Amino acid sequence: MADKVCCPGPICGSNNNAAGGGFREAVCVHTKKVYDSCRSKECLRDIRVFLCRDAQELLNAGGIASVKPRSAELLCVKIDVERVQFNRGFYTVDIRFFYRIECEVSCVIGRPRIIDGLAVFDKRVILFGGEGGARIFSSRFIEDDTDIQLCPDSNKPTAVVEVVDPILLDARIVSPDTSCNCCCCALHEVPRSICSCFGGGHLVVSGDESQVFV
């Protein structure tokens, strides 16, 4: 008599009938659970573009007739999850988006030039992440030897961000005396991996020079 075969699929059938495509008994699966989510469309404006030194010197030299937007590319997303005090189970998710902005600068004399720089946008949301506080221990099987003990883990929430590249609609040059120069336009630290996307060059973050906003 041929052996009965259990095919992967939902639990179904009766009288322990596995030929119907189901399991004879439930199977436990260790997986992640989605506790909460949100979705939004953002229309960003007045975002400063931090230029490389050579592009900044071109703006400071003057003689710029116009600046046109070309493209925007998402380079990286930095996520920080922290527990909300006095609100059990809820967490703040701070998200920082790093964009490469490319613009075309037309000079009064000479041909147009392409410049690029870094734009940063911050967003914060509050989501439910579960109330569990379990610690998880696991091991890796080794035959005829002591199993490897893996690093302990926990069921703390993990944030996942899905985003598409933006569409650049406008760009303009702002003189330092008319820009706000407030904390909303400040950039105090740029990760090394982001700097490498601009050839490892120094990004100008001071507010006393001509600036590009998108």
Residue ranges and their predicted role:
Residues 1-214:
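Viral structural modules
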